[in-house]
């Protein structure tokens, strides 16, 4: 599955720069894998978790991390939790929770 104008792949719509951030944080995720493996749901979930472990932290945000923070970081990058542009995505996620 490819979307976001062809820039993102897989069930979690992961961009290559997102993948690079995650595997830089957790190099074990790069072993025997490439970006294209983000089309695999289980691998993509590991990438998302590593990305959150890197950016969705209480130390970084300055308060306990919420589901909203995680969703908005996933959608808008490391500072996505601050961006107005990610609120629409959060509303979509809320409907699925």
What residues fall within each predicted segment?
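Alpha-helical segment that forms one wall of the substrate-binding/catalytic cleft
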Residues: 16-82, 90-97
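Short glycine- and hydrophobic/aromatic-rich loop-to-beta-strand nucleating segment
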Residues: 12-14
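Short acidic-hydrophobic sequence patches enriched in Asp/Glu that either
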Residues: 85
């Amino acid at each position: 599955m490819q979307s976001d104008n062809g820039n993102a792949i897989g069930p979690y719509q992961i961009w290559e720069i997102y993948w690079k951030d995650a595997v830089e944080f957790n190099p074990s995720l790069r072993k025997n894998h490439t970006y294209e493996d983000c089309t695999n749901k289980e691998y993509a979930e590991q990438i998302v978790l590593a990305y959150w472990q890197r950016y969705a932290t209480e130390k970084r945000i300055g308060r306990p991390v919420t589901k909203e923070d995680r969703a908005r970081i996933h959608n808008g990058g490391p500072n996505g939790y601050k961006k107005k542009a990610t609120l629409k995505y959060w509303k979509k996620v809320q409907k699925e929770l």
